[in-house]
Amino acid sequence: MKYGRTFNFSAGPAMMPEPVLEEIRDEMMNYRGSGMCVMEMSHRSPVFQQIIDEAEQDLRDLMGIPDNYKVLFIQGGATLQFSMIPMNLMKNGKAVYIETGAWSKKAIAEAKKVGEVVVAASSKDKNYTYVPDCSDLDIPEDTDYVYICENETIHGVTWNELPNTKGHTLVSDQSSMFLSKPCNVSDYGMIYAGVQKNVGPAGMIVAIIREDLIRDDLKDLPIYLQYSTHAGAGSMYNTPNCWAIYCCGKVFKYLKSIGGLEEMHKRNLDKAKVFYDFLDSSKMFKGTVEPEFRSLMNIPFVTESAELDKEVVAATKAAGYDNLKGHKSVGGLRASIYNAMPKEGVEALVEFLKNFEANYGK
């Protein structure tokens, strides 16, 4: 690759588009005549105000975000949202969660510290290799919201059809699929995503939240943990993650320039097909997720043994394919092929794995 870069299959932080990195490099020492790097400038300056305003508008354009939704840039990562969501949205003290993998499981554990959690469906019975049928969930009338993790980064499971919430607010963690395909924002009360997987550098989440869900009656909740604080201050109640906002803004513009989320989705379908076709034809490697629920972003796979898995990880790393080791909680291997991963990277990895299989033991 250019600049001696590697194909980085990390689940996050992950690759960013090369044209974006080049533009960031060119602006590093003197951002548009300001005489300083974005990392150095005041968040209260007119220059940075323009950066954050453009980032929000470009995201609104990309996703078609309605005017009655706020876009918030909040520090703390998706893990903080596991707590902030129930703290802010549990008006009646009850929420329904769907358990489809490690990240929804963690969100459930945190929400239970705040109020009552009803796990209406789970795929734990088959080690989170599918999404349960959620067309007719048992949802209590006084439920405040229904929560899903729309793409499970660790287990490689994705939702193809949203749950029937029976009129209740839907909240979705889209961290590892954010901006990978078109999304009808009006189907959700809230969408959030840690940006380090499919957009920019670590240290921030983007929250898209319907205005009627932003409460101003949470006086006993620490001020930073209230969505109303961030919404009222334009995501700048305190010093935000200026660098992440700037980098994400560049990615939003890049996605617009290539044809938006429709084009990105086509590319992602194409890349994933290359890898899944290989897995389905291989005798050494096999996918772990039921085909109907396979993620376009995170592809877990295994060999016949943990020892061979380790051999493959070592061999791929030596050949310039980084971060293919599966998550420590599940083992195996995992290829994360987010938006910024070029098709050539997937094709090159597949070719390497084919050769590894053909020559193994010879």
Model-derived features: positions:
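Active-site C-terminal subdomain of aminotransferase-like
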Residues: 190, 195-276, 290, 359-362
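PLP-dependent aminotransferase-like
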Residues: 79-146
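Conserved N-terminal alpha-helix of the aminotransferase class I/II PLP-enzyme fold
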Residues: 34-81, 88, 102, 110
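Active-site phosphate-binding strand-loop segment of PLP-dependent enzymes
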Residues: 12, 111, 123-178
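A glycine-/small-polar-enriched, mobile loop at the entrance of the PLP active site in fold-type I
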Residues: 5-56
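Conserved PLP-binding catalytic core of the aspartate aminotransferase-like
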Residues: 285-316
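PLP-dependent enzyme catalytic core of the Aspartate aminotransferase-like
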Residues: 1, 6, 318, 331-362
